[in-house]
């Protein structure tokens, strides 16, 4: 049986990691051993922050809705309670967009919530 040397496999593996580490600072983009650790850590951060991004955007939407609601004489919690009672099923993302870009439409939604309280 012929001897199998692993040069091709190792080079492919190293190249894959070093390509993923492109743009990293110093040895992190040049030295395989350091680059591998950097890529693994980057993956961990990416995994964590894909989940944190959802939290951050929801918090941003709530802050924007609250500001818009208070400009129309209602608190965020009262607005959401009113919308639930009125069976208005607009999600926070759309409400935040209305509060920022369509003040008249948002005011109409707030009035509907006020009426149901």
Curated annotation (Swiss-Prot):
GO terms for molecular function: rRNA binding; structural constituent of ribosome. Coiled coil: none annotated. GO terms for cellular component: ribonucleoprotein complex; ribosome. Keywords: Ribonucleoprotein, Ribosomal protein, RNA-binding, rRNA-binding. InterPro entries: Ribosomal_bL20, RIBOSOMAL_L20_CS, Ribosomal_protein_bL20_C. Gene3D superfamilies: 6.10.160.10, Ribosomal protein L20. GO terms for biological process: ribosomal large subunit assembly; translation. Belongs to the bacterial ribosomal protein bL20 family. Binds directly to 23S ribosomal RNA and is necessary for the in vitro assembly process of the 50S ribosomal subunit. It is not involved in the protein synthesizing functions of that subunit. This is Large ribosomal subunit protein bL20. It comes from Marinobacter nauticus (strain ATCC 700491 / DSM 11845 / VT8). The gene is rplT.
